[in-house]
Amino acid sequence: ICVVEVEGRKNLAPACKTVCTEGMVVRTHTPRVVNARRTVMELILSNHPNDCLTCTKNGHCELQRTAQDLGIREIKYRGETTKYQKDMSVSIVRDMDKCIMCRRCETACNEIQSVGVLSAVNRGFPAVVSTAFNDPIQTTNCINCGQCVAVCPTGALSENSNIADVLRAIADPSKTVVVQTAPAVRVGLGQDFGFSGRSVTGKMVTALRRLGFDYVFDTDFSADLTIMEEGTELLGLLNAAIG
């Protein structure tokens, strides 16, 4: 998808792997480049599920948006498609039928988080990003940080949603439903709704109460304890390294 035309080269070059040099002339939207991108996208879509309406990434999918930008309105190529069993942990759902082998999740897991759970397996058509020996992610060293989900451009990785369970609990008159929020939640809400740098605690609590929660608690105190404990641990490690 990221191919470009470099003056003086016979073949198209992948922009993500091409090193810039002084005086290089790069063309990004020539007819040849656009046609190549369309062909690559059509091949990707030929091995991709057609369940956009029910996909968790519908409306927020990079693959969907790129296909629209390229003007693709039909899938020209038909043939065998890959089939993988869905896998999930307490936090993450893996639907590898939707994996396009961009390998962003692998980079996030190995190079950013240094966990090393995800890597590319197989070659050619059956290639996919998976766990070692294709073990269920629940049995691996996954720390459920969610960074792989955050960078996934398709619905191959998504959050294991508990919204339906929460709504059922709220609707049950025999249950008292309690919600506990971390300090980061109100900060994130403030950024998402245009209140960056301002407290939205009151708005958040009001919204949760209107949803039907009986009690709303804040984890400020326990967060402070965590910071103190981790700070003490860091000082201990630094002193040990220096001493």
What are these regions (language model features)?
Residues 1-37, 41, 45, 159-243:
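Iron-sulfur-associated redox domains of electron-transfer enzymes in respiratory
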